[in-house]
Amino acid sequence: MKTVLEIHGLTKQFGQQAILQDLSLTIKEGDIYGLIGKNGAGKTTLIKIITQLLFADKGTVSLFSSQEENEWTKALSRVGSVIESPVAHNHLTAYQNLKYYCMIRHIPNADKVIHETLDYVGLSDTGKKVFRDFSLGMKQRLGIAIALLSKPDFLILDEPINGLDPIGIKEFRLMIQRLNQEKGITILISSHILSELYLLANRFGILDQGKIIREISKAEFETLSEDYIVLKTSDKERACQVLKEQIQLQFKVVNPDN
């Protein structure tokens, strides 16, 4: 499986404050990668470095195996992103906002692309309603629509479910899963809401105090999350027999000599 993003030893400081410290992570093609961390952990700073809105003090970032400056611009053309909040014009409709971005990106067959994109994100019936009057969920969907115009291979979303109501969160989740499964887009999503990332992602990076302290798969995550009972006994053989034959529980002997 190809590597979409690989980061090694990334460090970023603002003044004397270390925001990212020797951070490393890997995202493979087809992943929905959940970047989990509390507010202030460095998620947005990391995403801005990946998209070259900020530059690291140390470390390497490889995007689609590109590290050199002349390759990086081409690699970034394969990336769509919504960072912090969607960038759209308040007094334009959804269609007009996409038309504007098609013009500045020189996207051919703009009208067809716009209608297909609006339909895909569920905004085809917004009519003359302008962005200023959109609900938060609609604004997030328009932000994703703008990111999708260039048909990206890699989509980066920074805290996209903040402030959404339960229905909006569910609709967002289904849309992201469709993008991944139907269009094959690799996706990086940051959030501080672990319960929602768990329902979306297949791999997780846990960010704490500027470091990725662990990268785990969903299967590993589920194993770590299992409830268990620690049972101490002086009669190991009898306890194993009861658990297996009478209670029919899965168990593991972790200290056979004691």
Residue ranges and their predicted role:
Residues 64, 106, 205, 217, ...:
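A generic structural signal for secondary-structure junctions
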Residues 227-258:
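Short, charged/small-residue-rich alpha-helical element at the C-terminal edge
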Residues 5, 12-23, 27-189, 194-208, ...:
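ABC transporter nucleotide-binding domains
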Residues 8, 28, 231-234:
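A structural detector for beta-sheet-dominated domains
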Residues 1-3:
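Primarily ABC-family ATPase nucleotide-binding module
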Residues 55, 220-224, 253-256:
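Short, flexible turn/loop "capping" segments at secondary-structure junctions
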